[in-house]
């Protein structure tokens, strides 16, 4: 199956909207968190770490951390964020405690309606086995199995690290980090400096309750010219979308066009052999050659 590069996938649009409606753990804009978009980001060429700062303040003005950490899927997700070496080329060492944390997270998300619906869909498509335990083993492999991102190096990366945590290429170029919780926590620790928003072409600026945004920021001095992220959604929602797109195709790069709420998106998933290389939502009306 070739990756879909243009037409809207109506089957996945319907499914993903049902998953959106089922995402009871999603945090509510203006109530559970507040963002401040501020200025529009400037152009930054690829591999440049110089960016005009169009935002004097952090993106996240407020997050109800008590509520966030009271939700089991968020709490177990947050426990995974400090388990990785940032640089590719530096071998990852996975401790028994970290394996247990990975399993606790998968157990938590597999109890949600979102992941049960995703599992049911994949079983119907013969892309997952009916047993929840078999599905958990499959998810562990897709997301947490280590592989070498730098040629000739020891295993130094995995899908989860790239997408949800972020990593760097020789400390000079940042990669991944498409998750709002990690963005918030790194911003709170002063590791992330938000530079401004990248607007959709048909919209002069995003709204502060938008739940898909294109952002420019620096992370430990490395600039991300444009990084896209869902905002407020639960970890299980993102896991479900990216896993479904990954399993739907053997293509190296899958780009499924979907309509989700008010957004027209490409869900982009890059395959690293049998594992996820990267995954993110791309707002389709943003034509920027230096994305991601």
Swiss-Prot record:
One of its GO terms (molecular function) is RNA binding. PROSITE patterns: ENDOU. It comes from the Eukaryota. Coiled coil: none annotated. One of its GO terms (cellular component) is nucleus. The active site is at 162, 178, 224. Its main location: nucleus. The keyword Endoplasmic reticulum does not apply. Its cofactor is Mn(2+). Monomer. This is Poly(U)-specific endoribonuclease-B. It comes from Xenopus laevis.
């Amino acid at each position: 199956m070739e990756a879909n590069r243009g037409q809207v996938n109506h089957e996945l649009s319907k499914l993903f909207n049902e998953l959106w409606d089922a995402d009871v753990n999603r945090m509510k804009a203006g109530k559970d968190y507040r963002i401040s978009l501020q200025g529009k980001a400037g152009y930054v060429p690829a591999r440049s770490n110089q960016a005009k700062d169009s935002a004097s303040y952090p993106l996240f003005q407020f997050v109800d951390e008590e509520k966030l950490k009271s939700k089991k899927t968020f709490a177990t997700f947050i426990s995974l964020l400090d388990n990785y070496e940032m640089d590719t080329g530096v071998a990852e060492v996975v401790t028994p405690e970290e394996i247990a944390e990975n399993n606790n997270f998968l157990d938590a998300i597999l109890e949600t309606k979102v992941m049960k619906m995703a599992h049911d869909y994949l079983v119907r498509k013969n892309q997952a086995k009916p047993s929840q335990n078999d599905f958990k083993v499959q998810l562990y492999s897709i997301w947490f199995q280590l592989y070498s991102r730098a040629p000739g190096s020891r295993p130094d990366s995995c899908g989860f690290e790239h997408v949800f945590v972020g990593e760097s290429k020789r400390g000079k170029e940042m990669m991944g980090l498409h998750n709002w919780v990690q963005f918030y926590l790194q911003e709170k620790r002063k590791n992330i400096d938000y530079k401004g928003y990248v607007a959709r072409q048909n919209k002069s600026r995003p709204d502060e309750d938008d739940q898909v945004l294109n952002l420019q920021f620096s992370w430990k001095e490395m600039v991300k010219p444009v990084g896209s992220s869902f905002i407020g959604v639960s970890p299980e929602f993102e896991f479900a979308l990216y896993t479904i797109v990954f399993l739907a195709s053997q293509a190296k790069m899958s780009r499924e066009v979907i309509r989700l709420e008010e957004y027209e998106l490409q869900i982009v998933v890059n395959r690293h052999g049998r594992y996820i290389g990267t995954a993110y939502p791309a707002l389709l009306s943003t034509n920027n050659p230096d994305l991601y």
